[in-house]
């Protein structure tokens, strides 16, 4: 089944993280303790393995994943909201949620709004969402939560896990093109600032162009969503 394949790939992924320093992991699950019928439990979510150094709790996470069985509904919004209290009291912009799901919200919640609120409160940075072959017409309900990957095969699922992790850990680059009245990128020598979701200035540069008309390449923290 899709769940069996996902569990196998997640265990491989956790195995690799256990070898890295300065990584903390936790495991929250949903829809796994109460049967879907006769009554849906829209609060069916639990922090199964609290955050700790990956080398310390990777074995616990792998064991819990191995024994995990889907039983109930999909309370994504409620689960994201509950995860706010899961994280240790460290730099909140390092707090990341990696949501894995084979479906969409089933409990009338708004996971996109909950995700945005937690980002605005600086509890988490932008989440990552991996859908397990989610139908095209449903993907828009997930890609507003955070960066979305739709894994249509086991290979793409594992690739999505590592791509998300790489984005979480390493800096990224960007170029800013300032357009003139004719929609040409000729404007330059302008002071520009990058702001986090709370309006706090994170970076400030003077925009310049090279002799080839290319803007500077900027190095940014990928954990923060910016406005310019």
Predicted regions and their residues:
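Short amphipathic beta-strand segments in non-cytosolic proteins
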Residues: 190-213
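Exposed acidic/Ser/Thr-rich ligand/metal-binding surfaces
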Residues: 1-5, 11, 15, 19, ...
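C-terminal helix of von Willebrand factor
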Residues: 137-179
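Short Pro-Gly-centered beta-turn/loop motif in secreted/extracellular proteins
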Residues: 209-228
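Structural motif
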Residues: 101, 130-132, 177-190, 195-197
């Amino acid at each position: 089944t899709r769940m069996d394949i996902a569990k196998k790939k997640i265990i491989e992924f956790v195995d690799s993280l256990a070898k890295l320093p300065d990584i903390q992991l936790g495991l929250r699950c949903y829809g796994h303790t109460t049967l879907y019928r006769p009554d849906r439990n829209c609060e069916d979510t639990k922090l199964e393995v609290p955050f700790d150094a990956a080398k310390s709790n990777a074995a616990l996470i792998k064991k819990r994943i191995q024994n995990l069985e889907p039983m109930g509904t999909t309370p994504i919004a409620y689960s994201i909201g509950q995860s706010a209290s899961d994280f240790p009291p460290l730099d909140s912009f390092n707090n990341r949620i990696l949501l894995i799901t084979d479906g969409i919200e089933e409990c009338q919640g708004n996971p996109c709004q909950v995700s945005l609120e937690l980002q605005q409160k600086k509890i988490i940075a932008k989440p990552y969402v991996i859908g397990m072959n989610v139908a095209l017409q449903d993907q828009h309900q997930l890609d507003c939560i955070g960066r979305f990957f739709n894994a249509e095969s086991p290979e793409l699922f594992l690739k999505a896990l590592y791509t998300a992790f790489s984005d979480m850990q390493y800096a990224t680059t960007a170029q800013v093109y300032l357009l003139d009245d004719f929609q040409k990128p000729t404007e330059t020598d302008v002071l520009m600032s990058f702001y986090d979701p709370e309006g706090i200035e994170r970076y400030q540069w003077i925009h310049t162009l090279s002799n080839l008309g290319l803007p500077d390449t900027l190095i940014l923290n990928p954990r923060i969503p910016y406005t310019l």
